[in-house]
Amino acid sequence: MSQILEKILSEKALEVSSLKKNNSLSNLEKIGHGFKRRGFEKILFNFRTQKKLAVIAEIKKASPSKGQFKTDFDVEEISISYESNGAACISVLTDKKFFMGSLENLALARNKVQLPVLRKDFIIDPIQVAESFAIGSDCILL
């Protein structure tokens, strides 16, 4: 395993531990039921039946290998641009330490557009799946 991946997984284990101390799986699931899901699978199926390329556009501020991509980073503006230019879905990086993402970025994107929103993070525990559900993710990338 690469050194950076080991660091990321170690950090995720700490985050999961903190998440479990402050939340229960059942409470996060209950919160998640308050969101109307936007049909990630249905959107992709519709693009396919129309013989159109379905683009999942990514909101990503930084990466461990490239650093920060952009200093003026407006999640709402990016989301609107992706939707108006025909994206099928929006993927939002939520890893804070290594990709400068956040759960708040996912919420901002979700509140600004009607597209399904995917949470992209290093998901290593079922409580993170429940957390994703609780913040309004329509799907996750494992």
Regions found by a protein language model. Give the residues of each.
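An N-cap/entry alpha-helix motif that binds or orients negatively charged groups
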Residues: 2-70
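Conserved phosphate-coordination/catalytic loops
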Residues: 34, 69-73, 100, 123
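Surface-exposed amphipathic alpha-helices with a cationic face
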Residues: 45-49, 83, 106-111, 133
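Hydrophobic faces of well-ordered beta-strands that scaffold small-molecule active sites
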Residues: 55-59, 90-92, 117-120, 140-142
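Arg/Lys-rich RNA-binding interfaces used to dock onto structured RNA substrates
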Residues: 56-64, 73, 91-94, 103
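Alpha/beta enzyme core
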Residues: 67-93, 112, 126-139
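Active-site-adjacent beta->alpha loops and helix N-cap segments on the catalytic face
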Residues: 94-113, 122-130
